[in-house]
Design a protein with these regions (language model features):
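Anionic-ligand binding region
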Residues: 1-30, 36
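Conserved alpha/beta core of the MobA/IspD/sugar-nucleotide pyrophosphorylase nucleotidyltransferase superfamily
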Residues: 29-98
Length: 98
């Protein structure tokens, strides 16, 4: 899967109010789409989460992680960003008119 190294300082909070731990960013990466999986293994991993657990996953790679699949990391690209927020959409619109 494509990944980017973390540039920001990353904190863990157990309660959402105070910092519990400073995480070592040299071991943290931001995953990007699209990922590539062995279809049969990935399908089986997703089917194992049906019907109720599939809605609680944190991304399309999580079923593969939960199933113990080997997931190789490759260098991602800053220009490959997901449109999730209004700010992301504005960034995309700006790219279109350039």
């Amino acid at each position: 899967m494509p990944v980017l190294p973390m540039k920001d300082t990353v904190y863990l909070s157990e309660d959402g109010v105070s910092v519990s731990e400073l995480l070592n960013r040299s071991r943290l990466f931001a995953g990007q789409a699209p990922e590539l999986f062995d279809l049969e293994k990935y399908y089986t991993a997703n089917m194992a989460l049906l019907p109720d657990r599939i809605l609680s996953i944190n991304g399309s790679t999580e079923p593969a992680v939960m199933a113990g699949m080997d997931i190789a990391m490759v260098a991602g690209d800053e220009g490959n960003y997901k449109i999730t927020t209004a700010a992301d959409l504005e960034r995309f619109k700006e790219k279109l008119i350039q």
